[in-house]
Amino acid sequence: EFFDRNDFGIASFTIDPLNDTPMVLKQYSERLNVKSPNWHFLTGKIDDVYELSNSGFNIFSGVNPAVAGGFEHQGFFALIDKNGYIRSRRDANGNPIVYYLGITSSGASEQGIDMIKEDIIKLLNNGWI
């Protein structure tokens, strides 16, 4: 619902950069029927990808030969404002909820999807994105 806005974008980072070449990611975006020029599917050197995920966003991703596919990740979304800061909301106790849950392995939408949409609207309305 935000894709017609020039002040909103999505960056999706692969956690399997050895296999997810730019061509593979392009095909993936086509399978998802992504039409927005503001949704970017990104890859890079494996060490850089995991460094960005683990140290930049503090969202775990890494190689694990013991799991299906050989790698694992937390599957969270981070909401980043136009200044590069991670934005968050607070829970009932006033603690920050930094990341949003997305889609479960069964494909069910999590409450986090609704939460991130609400927070995107707040940031857009206040000029923070």
Tell where the protein language model's regions lie, with residue ranges.
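Sec/Tat-exported extracytoplasmic proteins
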Residues: 1, 32, 53-61, 120-128
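Soluble extramembrane regions of membrane proteins in the secretory/endomembrane system
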Residues: 28-31, 37-48, 54, 58-64, ...
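Structural microenvironment flanking redox-active thiols in thiol-disulfide oxidoreductases
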Residues: 1-52
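Thiol-/selenol-based redox modules, centered on thioredoxin-like
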Residues: 66-129
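Sparse, context-dependent recognition of short Cys/His-centered cofactor- or disulfide-binding micro-motifs
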Residues: 10, 26, 62-65, 101
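Glycine-rich loops and low-complexity Gly/Arg-rich segments
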Residues: 1, 34-39, 65-68, 102-105
